């Protein structure tokens, strides 16, 4: 009996250490993937942006833009084949698997008729953010270039600090229940409204692979304008 207990204890100890080793390996690979992304130049250059700056447009509401990552990555692979740019390796490489991710939180002009009518680059061309700050928000916005660009283009029009902007969009994102599989637009709307009571009677927006949820200036859910130019 004693020998059996000793054997069981030995098996337990071995399994425990194997589990620890597997966990260490997984998180080291995760960290390695993150380091690969942020150890590079991910600055966003305003003069190269095709839409440009609009620092006089008012902010009347916000749009949280969520992207279905598998579809986004499929499009990137069609474009680049096996030669993905470094900026896409974290999101679309083989080490990570994302579903719905944050594209950005956009201050919006309620009277906009085109994308350029919305607030953009309100603080001008900003310096590259610290690596540690970028790493913190990669789980929900899986790209250093994405985070840097969204801060410069959109976040700086409503927030004084990048961290406050990233915290707010992550806070909104984490209140949501989102499907783990792809759905057609109307099915997606039904699923989201059924599983998020706060959105039940709310008009949502969508593009081909993105979902739009709108908020007033106090970050209460509101109907997205039906003819909005995102």
Which role fits each region the language model picked out?
Residues 2-14:
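N-terminal Sec-pathway targeting helices
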Residues 11-13, 22-23, 32-33:
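Secretory/periplasmic and organellar redox-cofactor proteins
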Residues 15-25, 41, 129-230:
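C-terminal, well-folded lobe of enzymatic/effector domains
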Residues 19, 37-39, 57, 63, ...:
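Alpha-helical structural elements
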Residues 28-42:
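Ser/Thr/Pro/Gly-rich low-complexity linker/stalk segments immediately outside membranes or between
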Residues 32-34, 76, 159-160, 174:
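Amphipathic alpha-helical interaction segments
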Residues 47-140:
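Betabetaalpha-Me/HNH-type nuclease active-site subdomain
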């Amino acid at each position: 009996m004693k020998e059996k207990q000793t054997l069981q204890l030995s098996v337990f100890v071995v399994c425990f250490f194997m589990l620890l080793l597997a966990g260490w390996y997984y998180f080291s690979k995760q960290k390695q993937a993150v380091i690969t992304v942020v150890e590079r130049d991910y600055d966003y250059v305003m003069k190269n942006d095709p839409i440009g700056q609009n620092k006089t447009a008012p902010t009347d509401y916000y749009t949280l833009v969520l992207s279905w990552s598998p579809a986004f990555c499929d499009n990137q692979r069609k474009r680049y084949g096996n030669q993905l740019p470094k900026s896409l390796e974290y999101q679309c490489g083989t080490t990570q698997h994302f579903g719905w991710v944050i594209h950005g939180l956009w201050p919006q002009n309620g009277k906009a008729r085109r994308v350029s009518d919305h607030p953009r680059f309100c603080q001008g061309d900003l310096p590259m953010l610290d690596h540690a700050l970028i790493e913190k928000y990669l789980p929900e916005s899986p790209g250093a270039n994405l985070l840097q660009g969204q801060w410069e283009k959109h976040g700086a029009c409503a927030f004084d600090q990048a961290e406050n902007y990233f915290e707010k969009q992550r806070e909104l994102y984490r209140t949501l229940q989102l499907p783990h599989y792809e759905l057609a637009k109307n099915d997606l709307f039904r699923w989201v409204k059924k599983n998020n009571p706060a959105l039940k009677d709310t008009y949502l927006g969508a593009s081909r692979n993105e979902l739009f949820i709108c908020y007033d200036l106090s970050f209460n859910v509101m109907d997205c304008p039906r003819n909005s130019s995102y």
